[in-house]
């Protein structure tokens, strides 16, 4: 199985470090056949990566489960017609407070995109904003994303 993550920037953020660790471990344990990280921008990142990192223009060649980590990335990812199972990872810390456009985007996410919350606090915030539920990840692992 192929698992990819789409992030805005390759950088040393808490979320990115978790993603790097998840993909590295999944490859070592043979939980996935291929791991990919797609990005829009590159920043300094000293983390070891045992998976491919590609500019977002290469998303058109990807097939598998794609986890999108920011609302601003969904429009591009949603236009891809390959065999992609799209998952949006909602993390309260990535939302811009007071951004009405982002809130409307959150409410109108396509019903074909599965939404998962990073933690319980994010799940409560997602429900408060949208009136919809977004299950919490039991653990941040490849198996959790692949079984969606």
Description of each model-found segment:
Residues 10-11, 93, 120:
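Short, glycine/serine-rich, charged loops/turns that create anion-binding
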Residues 76-77, 99, 111-136, 143-146:
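A short, active-site helix/loop in glycosyltransferases that binds the activated sugar's phosphate group
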Residues 1-62, 135-148:
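N-terminal pre-catalytic "stem/leader" segment of glycosyltransferase-like enzymes
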Residues 19, 70, 119-120:
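A structural signal for well-ordered alpha-helical scaffolds and beta->alpha junctions
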Residues 34-41, 87-89, 115-118:
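Short internal beta-strands
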Residues 22-30, 73-78, 126-130:
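Hydrophobic, Leu/Ile/Phe/Ala-enriched alpha-helical segments that form helix-helix packing faces
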Residues 29-30, 108-113:
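A structural motif corresponding to the C-terminal end of an alpha-helix
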Residues 41-110:
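Extended catalytic core of nucleotide-activated donor transferases of GT-like folds
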């Amino acid at each position: 199985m192929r698992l990819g993550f789409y992030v805005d920037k390759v950088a040393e953020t808490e979320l990115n470090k978790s993603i790097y660790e998840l993909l590295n471990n999944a490859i070592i344990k043979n939980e996935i056949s291929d791991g990919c990280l797609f990005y829009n921008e590159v920043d300094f990142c000293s983390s070891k990566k045992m998976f491919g990192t590609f500019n977002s223009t290469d998303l058109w060649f990807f097939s598998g489960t794609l986890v999108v980590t920011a609302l601003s990335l969904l429009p591009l990812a949603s236009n891809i017609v390959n065999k992609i199972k799209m998952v949006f990872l909602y993390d309260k810390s990535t939302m811009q407070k007071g951004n009405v456009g982002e809130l409307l985007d959150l409410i109108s996410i396509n019903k074909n995109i599965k939404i998962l919350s990073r933690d319980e606090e994010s799940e409560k915030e997602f429900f408060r904003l949208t009136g919809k539920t977004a299950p919490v990840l039991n653990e941040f692992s490849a198996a959790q994303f692949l079984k969606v």
